[in-house]
Amino acid sequence: MELVFIRHGFSEWNAKNLFTGWRDVNLTERGIEEAKSAGQKLKAAGYEFDIAFTSVLTRAIKTCNIVLEESNQLWIPQVKNWRLNERHYGALQGLDKKATAEQYGDEQVHIWRRSYDISPPDLDAADPNSAHNDRRYAHLPKDVIPNAENLKITLERVLPFWEDQIAPALLSGKRVLVTAHGNSLRALAKHIIGISDAEIMDFEIPTGQPLVLKLDDKLNFVEKFYL
């Protein structure tokens, strides 16, 4: 069986080189074109889906919609869930990456960005931009909403959704598309492929490129490739 991952198209804050995380920003024109191209590639390669999973952030939802529209599959069920959100970058969200490196030093920012188990500083829950003040998360217990995450915590957040939703869909024979974010997809890939803590730091997923994971009938990893 095959599972298709797509990282959302290039966003407004990708273009501005800002830390994004759970902040909700839109796609750029480049990002829209990337999503269209992804949908066209999937259509040309004959990929059909029974269900699509995405996050509750606009850039991933729009990418999912565009991909499905371009491949004439906009009608299939879509499941939006916060567990597929990008890694939460804490107090770094909204900051310029270059300016942050100048303030704290390249080494410290590199640790915050690339360490598997070290998180950036927390975002104050009372901050107007905190997810605690966003009604899309109002149904969640306050202690579940993160104030900052590393990749290890992101994996712990994403894994229950894999086990409860994505894996059962695959095992039931459904053809699955997951349109999400660089780090939530990296976390899933780490689990599925069996990438080590050290190796995952160099594992990147480009924006808007369909990544196909081939799995056996027990969801063991076989191979991966980009369309």
From Swiss-Prot:
Pathway: Carbohydrate degradation; glycolysis; pyruvate from D-glyceraldehyde 3-phosphate: step 3/5. The active site is at H8, E86. InterPro entries: His_Pase_superF_clade-1 (IPR013078), His_PPase_superfam (IPR029033), Phosphogly_mut1 (IPR005952). It holds the Pfam family His_Phos_1. Its EC number is 5.4.2.11. One of its GO terms (molecular function) is phosphoglycerate mutase activity. The record marks H181 as: Transition state stabilizer. One of its GO terms (biological process) is glycolytic process. Gene3D superfamilies: Phosphoglycerate mutase-like (3.40.50.1240). Keywords: Gluconeogenesis, Glycolysis, Isomerase. It catalyses: (2R)-2-phosphoglycerate = (2R)-3-phosphoglycerate. It is an enzyme of class 5 (isomerase). Catalyzes the interconversion of 2-phosphoglycerate and 3-phosphoglycerate. Homodimer. Belongs to the phosphoglycerate mutase family. BPG-dependent PGAM subfamily. HAMAP family: PGAM_GpmA. NCBIfam families: pgm_1, PRK14115.1, PRK14118.1. This is 2,3-bisphosphoglycerate-dependent phosphoglycerate mutase.
